[in-house]
Amino acid sequence: MSNSAVYAVPQVKKTSATTTSKTTFHFAAGLCSGLSSAILLQPADLLKTRVQQSQNAALLPTIKSIISSPNGIRGLWRGTLPSALRTGFGSALYFTSLNALRQGLAHTGVPVALSSASANGKGVASSSALPKLSNSANLATGAAARVAAGFVMMPVTVLKVRYESSYYAYGSLYSAGRDILRTEGVRGLFAGFGATAARDAPYAGLYVLFYEQLKRRFASLADSGTGDQSLKSSSSSINFVSGALAAGLATAITNPFDAVKTRLQLMPNKYGNMMRAVKLMVHEDGVRSLLGGLGLRITRKALSSALAWTVYEELILRAEKHWATRD
């Protein structure tokens, strides 16, 4: 067996039934990967929200305050339902859209797809289930897919942030949604979308760009190993490490947008819009306020992205092999 046989994605005969089933499976794989990462990493997400809501909020006192509350340790998982819905269905929409965009670009004839040689290096096949695109195409497809998914899931995101925050004493998600609609109208459910899009578009674009580049480099190193079995076992490792590193880099670059987004969603009447929020945050809390929650966000994003993408790619690769043998 050659090295390329380990990573190569089987060619599946294009039929309408196959296209439909593959789209459904991309959605299901994205949902599964998103749900698993959201539930496991909810404490980090909740702590990030609490730290970002005020520059004076330190991590350790925040943890002690939550644990000493009546709910105890369970308080760290407050907001898990909206977080799981947002991340689960958001990931499902994102991966489905990303696959559709990449498949579409790869078959348009536009020079955005890498050749087999340039994509894989010297005989190294890819551990990815997605088509190989150029750097600019990776950037564009990642950004477009994330913004589209973010817009659809925005109401759930606002509910999640409000419910996790200590600013509001919502007893349930229903009461949170009812209060937002009563006091702010439908617009309130989309508070902070501008900052979210400004964060998500570059983040997702940079993530896909870094992720694909890192995978090619790590695959080149794995190719110098000793045989096919070592390559098989390293496929998931390549995806996981690449995902964690790519998320860390993209998160560090885009964290100011995340800090602004959180303030806008918590106090839309005070901050108004993205530019006003930046000015007020810097004036009241200093430039450091734009880096609030960076450590927590890097930790959570690195783990969640690595987990989500590894689970997603492994499920898709297994499905591709199944479809190939069936056809």
Curated annotation (Swiss-Prot):
InterPro entries associated with the record: Hem25/SLC25A38, Mitochondrial_sb/sol_carrier, Mt_carrier_dom_sf
Solcar repeats (start-end): 21-104, 136-217, 234-318
Q: Name one GO molecular function term.
A: glycine transmembrane transporter activity
Q: Which GO terms describe its cellular component?
A: mitochondrial inner membrane
Record-level GO BP terms:
glycine import into mitochondrion; heme biosynthetic process
What the entry lists under Pfam families is as follows: Mito_carr
Task: Give the catalytic activity.
Answer: glycine(in) = glycine(out)
Topology versus the membrane: Multi-pass membrane protein
Transmembrane residues, as ranges?
A: 27-52, 79-105, 139-164, 192-215, 238-264, 293-311
Query: Where's it mainly located?
Result: mitochondrion
Do you know which Gene3D superfamilies this protein is assigned to? Answer: Mitochondrial carrier domain
Keywords on record: Membrane, Mitochondrion, Mitochondrion inner membrane, Repeat, Transmembrane, Transmembrane helix, Transport
Q: Which HAMAP family match?
A: SLC25A38 (MF_03064)
Q: State the family named in the UniProt similarity comment for this chain.
A: Belongs to the mitochondrial carrier (TC 2.A.29) family. SLC25A38 subfamily.
The job of this chain, per UniProt, is described as: Mitochondrial glycine transporter that imports glycine into the mitochondrial matrix. Plays an important role in providing glycine for the first enzymatic step in heme biosynthesis, the condensation of glycine with succinyl-CoA to produce 5-aminolevulinate (ALA) in the mitochondrial matrix.
Q: What is this protein called?
A: Mitochondrial glycine transporter
- The organism is Aspergillus oryzae (strain ATCC 42149 / RIB 40) (Yellow koji mold)
